[in-house]
């Protein structure tokens, strides 16, 4: 692993544990095993490290979870919808990098405008728009009953977002949270999906 990557990894762990303001460049360098001034050969400072972390996490999240612009293929039936959605949720709950980024975002969302925007996109607006597109596609295929896809996306995603937040605060509840999310998804499908899959 390159020194530049080690800096990002250690900075992410420290930012998640101590917050952005509670983490100094010298502490990051110490964790990496280099002197503070050596860190500046790789990054201009702490803000550039933070921005690089957000960029890397956004790319990983888009690739593994999806986004409004990358919804993946439209599920063809109830079980595929549940399977794909639960895989996405499992990724977001269990991926160590994404979990640390989320902890950082939650702590820093009130102090940093970019972090505030990223947090809103991943926990509210973006995820709802993504699922509205998926739900609309499933409506167009005759899988989900015609309704307001944006409202259905809120109904689908809000409980999952709350359970993910609970799991972050209480990691011992992770399995319980996953079970609740799946139970909610099955209820959602029972209410809104047509009886064919």
Q: Language-model features: where?
A:
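Hydrophobic alpha-helical connector segments
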Residues: 52, 66-99, 150-156, 197
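Short alpha-helical elements of helix-turn-helix
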Residues: 5, 9, 103
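Helix-turn-helix
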Residues: 6, 14-56
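Hydrophobic/aromatic-rich alpha-helical bundle segments in the mid-to-C-terminal region
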Residues: 117, 121, 135-187, 197
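Helix-loop "lid/cap" segments that line or gate small-molecule binding pockets
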Residues: 86-94, 102-110, 188-192
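Hydrophobic/aromatic residues within well-ordered alpha-helical segments
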Residues: 46, 53, 57-61, 85, ...
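Amphipathic alpha-helical packing segments from all-alpha helical-bundle domains
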Residues: 94, 100, 106, 113-140
């Amino acid at each position: 692993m390159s020194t530049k990557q080690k800096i990002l990894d250690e900075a992410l762990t420290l930012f998640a544990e101590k917050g952005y303001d509670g983490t100094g460049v010298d502490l990051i360098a110490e964790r990496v095993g280099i002197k503070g001034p050596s860190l500046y050969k790789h990054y201009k400072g702490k803000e550039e490290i933070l921005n690089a972390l957000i960029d890397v996490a956004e790319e990983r999240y888009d690739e593994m979870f999806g986004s409004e612009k990358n919804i993946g293929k439209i599920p063809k039936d109830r079980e595929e919808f549940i399977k794909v959605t639960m895989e996405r949720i499992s990724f977001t709950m269990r991926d160590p990098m994404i979990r640390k980024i989320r902890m950082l975002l939650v702590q820093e969302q009130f102090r940093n405008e970019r972090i505030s925007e990223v947090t809103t996109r991943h926990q509210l607006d973006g995820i709802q728009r993504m699922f509205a597109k998926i739900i609309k596609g499933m409506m167009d295929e005759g899988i989900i009953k015609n309704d307001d896809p944006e409202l259905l996306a809120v109904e689908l995603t809000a409980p999952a977002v709350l359970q993910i937040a609970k799991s972050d605060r209480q990691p011992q509840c992770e399995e319980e949270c996953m079970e609740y999310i799946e139970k909610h998804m099955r209820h959602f499908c029972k209410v809104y999906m047509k009886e064919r899959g």
